Amino acid sequence: MAEIKNYTLNFGPQHPAAHGVLRLVLELDGEVIQRADPHIGLLHRATEKLAEHKTYIQALPYMDRLDYVSMMCNEHAYVMAIEKLLGIEPPLRAQYIRVMFDEITRLLNHLMSLGSHALDVGAMAVFLYAFREREDLMDCYEAVSGARMHAAYYRPGGVYRDLPDTMPQYGESSKYRGEKDLRIMNDARSGSLLDFIEDFTNRFPACVDEYETLLTDNRIWKQRLVGIGVVDPERAKALGFTGPMLRGSGVAWDLRKMQPYEVYDLVDFDVPVGVNGDCYDRYLVRIAEMRESNRIIRQCVEWLRNNPGPVMVENHKVAPPKRTGMKTNMEDLIHHFKLFTEGFHVPPGEAFASIEHPKGEFGIYLVSDGANKPYRLKIRAPGFAHLQSLDEMARGHMIADAVTIIGTQDIVFGEIDR
């Protein structure tokens, strides 16, 4: 009798559930996974090497393009590493703005993660609902930086500019959008950015309730997630898990609480933790994190309303001159030109800065030789540690469960391939 052998299947890199350019080589016994071999590198752009040939400010936009769903959080770790080497501290208002936008970015990331995960499993409505809320948050990015995704808003020593007093309005009516629709859409945009964000934070808890109504007690959703991809706490720590992946396994580790940076020690929030370490618990952790991020944003909005002040450090070697001065003063124009073409020199040394990124612990290790460019930049991407556990998490599961596991890992290849 002929021996029945396992067969090998290519999953991706063109598969819609591969979250980018993941290529998985699956060894299958029938439809049960015996081995999962992730192939990475299809989105490698040599970010770490490119940064060595740019000044510290010119390398900043590369950070946005790492995890291109959590743009400002990537920038945050990078500017914190530079600030450590320079020995400077941004003004308190700039720190609150950074924390507020870190949490807006966390919402952007978790909404994308939740929507795409639900879509992978077969629930299409949640994806559309999540993108409805992401649109408002993208408008916040656009209001402060002019860009909806790659903001380049954080700067060594603070942020690019203070929060605007006006929000962009929707334009003329069309056959798709009448005058009444325009009035409703522009109603929340009649005030400042802080008014717009406050209006969003008032609406958002009800939106999260909508997602939970659709998913949390949904029989099919629970059948697809409960007991899938279980990782116990000890194994999660051994594999290098961080963020929701670690907290979903029951380990209450959050850098915002354990090693507070910026003003996280001045805001009130809780760290949600799972119990079983399966895909369902990780989903619940992300849902709870969205509620906590909303709380933090509300506190930041209240503080920023009552405390005007500078948003950039008073150090002219690092901070650019004011735009108004450049129009009348030749020295300011020369200063601006030299700062952005030649950059600033950073004292020799090394620094590591890590933040609680939406996906986990995102770190930047920066080595300076005293020049105006980094001597070495090393990126610690949380998704890299999560992806290497895919083989272990998927063994013994069906092919359909591999899709669920990839979704729960919240993988973005910009940061994994770098």
Swiss-Prot record:
GO terms assigned for molecular function: NAD binding; NADH:ubiquinone reductase (non-electrogenic) activity; quinone binding
Keyword annotations from UniProtKB, A to Z: Cell inner membrane, Cell membrane, Membrane, NAD, Quinone, Translocase, Transport, Ubiquinone
Pfam families (alphabetical): Complex1_49kDa
Presence of keyword tRNA processing: no
EC number: 7.1.1.-
UniProt-annotated location(s): Cell inner membrane
Record-level GO cellular component terms: plasma membrane
SUPFAM superfamilies linked to this entry: HydB/Nqo4-like
Matching NCBIfam families: NuoD (TIGR01962), PRK06075.1 (NF004739)
Protein name: NADH-quinone oxidoreductase subunit D
Phylogenetic placement of the source organism: Bacteria, Pseudomonadati, Pseudomonadota, Betaproteobacteria, Burkholderiales
Gene: nuoD
